[in-house]
């Protein structure tokens, strides 16, 4: 069984679909260039029910950006695209657990120590010319993770779908997986049936 995170939620309907499906985490994207960007107003409409741990995704964030979100919504985890030092600073400042996103093309890219953080999101490096660091529906060769001794808890992401998540778990050894574009009918538009299918497939893996 792999735990499942559904990221990029923007509406109460899809948040409810993820929680009702049994998702282990729900994620919200606070990066304006992403089609999954959620505004503070939309976050308020989703509500403050914290039955499932919430994760906020930020890219090279200024502290004020995180503070604005935390005034509206508690976040159990910050998923940050930045260097280790910046991630540690945000962890110390806000007292939240921090997962650092790490782009991987080969085994050499995998973290070798915990960097003073709570975990990692391991995904493919963005394609050349991409305007965002994640959510690009691109997978990497999961076989590069064979023999890796993870220094902290981690989630596998990048190009995952209901159809391939079981194979990804087997090949990588992941105990947790993260999906965004793989449960969408169009960029930024989550599909309730795909959310249900993904969580079920991950939990059955």
Swiss-Prot record:
UniProtKB keywords: Amino-acid biosynthesis, Aromatic amino acid biosynthesis, Isomerase, Tryptophan biosynthesis
Pfam families xref list: PRAI
Entry annotated with the keyword Transmembrane helix: no
GO biological process: L-tryptophan biosynthetic process
Catalytic activity line of the entry: N-(5-phospho-beta-D-ribosyl)anthranilate = 1-(2-carboxyphenylamino)-1-deoxy-D-ribulose 5-phosphate
Pathway: Amino-acid biosynthesis; L-tryptophan biosynthesis; L-tryptophan from chorismate: step 3/5
One Gene Ontology molecular-function label: phosphoribosylanthranilate isomerase activity
Alphabetized InterPro entries for the sequence: Aldolase_TIM, PRAI_dom, RibuloseP-bd_barrel, TrpF_fam
Enzyme class (EC, first level): isomerase
EC number in record: 5.3.1.24
Membership in a protein family: Belongs to the TrpF family.
HAMAP family in UniProt: PRAI (MF_00135)
Name of the protein: N-(5'-phosphoribosyl)anthranilate isomerase
Gene (UniProt): trpF
């Amino acid at each position: 069984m792999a735990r499942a995170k559904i990221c990029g939620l923007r509406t109460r309907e899809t948040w409810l679909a993820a929680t009702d499906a049994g998702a282990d985490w729900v994620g919200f994207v606070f990066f304006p260039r992403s089609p999954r960007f959620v505004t503070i107003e939309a976050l308020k409409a989703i509500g403050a029910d914290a039955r499932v741990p919430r994760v906020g995704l930020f890219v090279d964030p200024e502290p004020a950006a995180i503070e604005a979100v935390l005034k509206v919504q508690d976040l159990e985890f910050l998923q940050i695209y930045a260097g280790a030092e910046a991630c540690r600073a945000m962890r110390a400042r806000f007292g939240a657990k921090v997962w650092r996103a790490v782009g991987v093309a080969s085994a050499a890219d995998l973290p070798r120590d915990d960097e003073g953080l709570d975990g990692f999101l391991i995904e493919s490096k963005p394609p050349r010319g991409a305007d965002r660091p994640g959510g690009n529906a691109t997978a990497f060769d999961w076989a590069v993770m064979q023999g890796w001794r993870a220094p902290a808890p981690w989630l596998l992401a990048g190009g995952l779908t209901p159809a391939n998540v079981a194979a990804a778990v087997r090949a990588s050894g992941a105990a947790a997986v993260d999906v965004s574009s793989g449960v969408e009918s169009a960029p930024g538009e989550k599909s309730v049936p795909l959310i249900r299918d993904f969580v079920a497939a991950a939990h059955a893996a």
